[in-house]
């Protein structure tokens, strides 16, 4: 009996230790920008993914499957991010994607001179559900949702709020499919929390990971995982190819 107890302890200890970590992944959407790859809606015209963008999203999904990801996927409400997340999810994810407006793109950057505002030039709730039926829209989410004239500092604040909320009110690993501009806010915020992530170009479907100690909410490791799955011929920054 003692041997059985010892055996169980030896098995459960590493499992318990592993459970004390959780990883937040942030991915940019796939390649977009070709005027031929656009979709017109009631209040806006949205970029859809270019052929390489679709391949990038598929590569992202295949990699997330290899990681054994079993957490929750959040996605920005833009068409290009919804499309990226939906394509990637086919490889590894069976639950609904959760819409998260706090990870939407930054529109004003440092040059914003007017007060931040909300514009109707965005997808409606009905349009999102019609085009992406696997997306869950939180009941508290307000429409319209798209911000205009937002400074980087305000974007940093909403990302900080999002990370705090997810750390406090969710469990398990997280994947957030968002945008190149807002990923800069993510990096700045994560560096405040213990990472030392370099400022660099955020390629289409880049994937950055930040692992937290669940007990302290401190970052214990971080990585750019893009090169683990992205072929060299698929490195793009929208219309710029490398």
What does each model-identified segment do?
Residues 4-15:
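Sec-dependent N-terminal signal peptides
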Residues 20-22, 105-126, 188-242:
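Acidic, low-complexity terminal tails and accessory targeting/binding regions
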Residues 21-100, 152:
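Active-site-proximal alpha-helix that buttresses catalytic centers in soluble enzyme cores
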Residues 24, 171-177, 195:
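Residue-level preference for the first positions of well-ordered beta-strands
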Residues 43, 141-156:
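Surface-exposed cleft-lining segments at the edges of enzyme active sites
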Residues 67-69, 166-173:
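Glycine-rich phosphate-binding loop signature in dinucleotide/nucleotide-binding domains
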Residues 70-102, 129-142, 211-242:
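Conserved histidine-centered catalytic loops in small-molecule metabolism enzymes
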Residues 75-76, 157, 177-178:
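Short beta-strand scaffold positions
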């Amino acid at each position: 009996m003692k041997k059985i107890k010892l055996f169980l302890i030896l098995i459960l200890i590493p499992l318990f230790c592993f459970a004390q970590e959780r990883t937040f992944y942030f991915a940019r959407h796939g390649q977009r920008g070709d005027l031929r790859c656009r979709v017109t809606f009631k209040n806006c015209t949205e970029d859809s993914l270019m052929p390489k963008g679709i391949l990038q999203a598929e590569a992202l999904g295949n990699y997330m499957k290899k990681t054994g990801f079993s957490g929750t996927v959040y996605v920005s409400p833009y068409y290009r991010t919804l499309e990226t997340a939906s394509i990637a999810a086919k490889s590894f994810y069976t639950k609904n994607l959760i819409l998260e407006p706090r990870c939407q793109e930054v529109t004003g950057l440092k040059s914003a001179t007017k007060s931040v505002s909300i514009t109707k030039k965005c997808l409606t709730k009905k349009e999102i559900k019609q085009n992406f039926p696997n997306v869950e829209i939180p009941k508290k989410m307000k429409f319209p949702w798209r911000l205009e004239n937002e400074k980087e500092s305000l974007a940093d604040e909403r990302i900080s709020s999002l990370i705090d909320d997810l750390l406090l009110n969710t469990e398990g690993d997280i994947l957030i499919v968002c945008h190149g501009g807002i990923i800069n806010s993510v990096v700045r915020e994560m560096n405040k929390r213990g990472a030392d992530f370099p400022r660099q170009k955020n390629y289409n479907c880049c994937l950055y990971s930040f692992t937290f100690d669940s007990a302290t909410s401190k970052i214990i490791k971080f990585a750019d995982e893009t090169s683990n799955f992205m072929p060299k011929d698929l490195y793009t920054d929208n219309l710029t190819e490398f």
